[in-house]
Amino acid sequence: MLRGLASLGLAAALSGRGRAFARRDEIEMLVLGDSLIWGQGLREEEKFYYLTKRWLEEDVFKGNGRVRLTVKAHSGSTIKLDPDEQAALERGKRSAFEELHPEVNVSFPTIEKQLRSAHSEHRDPARVDLLMLSGGIPDVGVAKIINPLESNKKLRERIDLYCRRHMGELVAEAAEKFPNSLIILVGYYPIITRHSPMKRIVNDIMELYSVPGWAKPPINNPATRAIWRLWRGKMIKRSRIWLEDSNAAFTEVVEGLNAGSGRQRAVFVPSPIDERAAFGTKNSLLFTVGRKGRPADSIGETRLRECPPALAELRRDTRLKYSTRFCELASVGHPTPEGSAAIAAAIQERLDPLLARRFNGRVQPASK
C-alpha cells in the first residue's frame, strides 16, 4: 500500500511545492556537467551521483521506489563553447553535439548543450525531480588557476565570468526547462595547498607534459625544487582564490535563483575535500599519476585505448592542439573513490533537512 507513496512524497519535498503530484513508483534524476560530476576515473558504482541514487532508493525509499537516472555529463565539458573552438569544429566539419567516450576530456557537448539535449529528449520535463550539476573549472582552466606567473586579478575575472555569469545563465535555463526539479550545484575543492609536497607537484606536471625520463632528474631534485618553491606560495594563493571565489559565485547563483523563484529551487553543496585532503597530501582524496607514469585509476586503460584515436582525428580535422597525454592522465586531481564518497555524503547531508521539513523530521517518507 505504501509503494509509490515514497516517490510521491519525495517529489513533493524536493520540488518545494504544495501541489498534488501524480502517484509514481520512481523519481527522475538528471546529471549534467564536467569531469567532476561525471566521476573521472571511477567505476559507475563509485560515482557520487550513483551513490546519491542508491541512498535515495535504499535509505529514503527503503526499497519502495526507484530513481531513474539520466547522465549527460562528460569529462572536459565547458558551460559554453569557446568561439575559436566552435569555428575550428565547423571548419573541420565536426559537430559540437558529437559525443565521444565520456572519459575523453573535450569541451563539447557543452553543459548548455547537455541541458538542451536532455530537455528535447524528455517526454515530460516536468517529471524531473533532481538535477545534479557541476561546471566552471574547465572554462577557467586548471593550468591558469595554478600558474604563478599570471595575474590574480585576471583569475578573479575569469572565475566571475564562468562561475557566476555563465553558471547563472545555465542554472536559470535549467530551472525554466525542468520546472519541478531541485537543482543540486556541486562545488570544487582546493587544487594545491601548503600540504601538497613539491616533489609530487613537479613529478605529475612532468608526466602531463611528457618530459622524457632522462630529463626528469635535472628538473626534479632537491636543488631545483628550491627554485620551484619560490613559486609554490603563489600557486597555493591562486588555488585558494579559486576555491573561495568559485564558492562565492556558486552561492550567489543559487541564492539569486531561489530569491527570484520565491521558493527553494536550488542548493549549493561545497566540496568536503579540504586543504589536508587536496592534491598530493598525505591523506589526499584525489588521484595522482600512478607508477611509471600510468593512470592510477581503475578506468585508465579505457582512456589509454580511447584517447589516442579520438584526439588524433580531432587534431587532424580542426588543427587544434588536443593533448593525448592530458587525456590519458585525466584522472589526476579528481576524487578517488573515497573522495567521491565524501562528496556523496555532503550531498546527502544537504538534502536531509529538505526531506525532514516535509516529513516532520523523518527523512524516510514511506512511513506508516
Residue ranges with predicted function:
Residues 2-20:
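N-terminal export signals
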Residues 21-86:
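Serine-esterase "nucleophile elbow" of acetyl-processing enzymes
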Residues 28-31, 37, 68-73, 129-134, ...:
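Structural recognition of the beta-strand scaffold that forms the well-ordered cores
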Residues 32, 89-159, 184, 188-204, ...:
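Oxyanion-hole/transition-state-stabilizing segment in secreted/luminal serine hydrolases
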Residues 35-38, 74-79, 136-142, 189-193, ...:
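Solvent-exposed loop/turn segments at secondary-structure junctions
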Residues 75-111, 280-296:
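Charged, often glycine-rich, active-site loop that binds/positions anionic groups
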Residues 160, 164, 168, 337-348:
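Short, amphipathic alpha-helical "lid/cap" segments that border enzyme active or binding sites
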Residues 197-240, 244, 252-256, 263-334:
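Mobile gating loops/cap/lid regions near enzyme active sites that modulate substrate access
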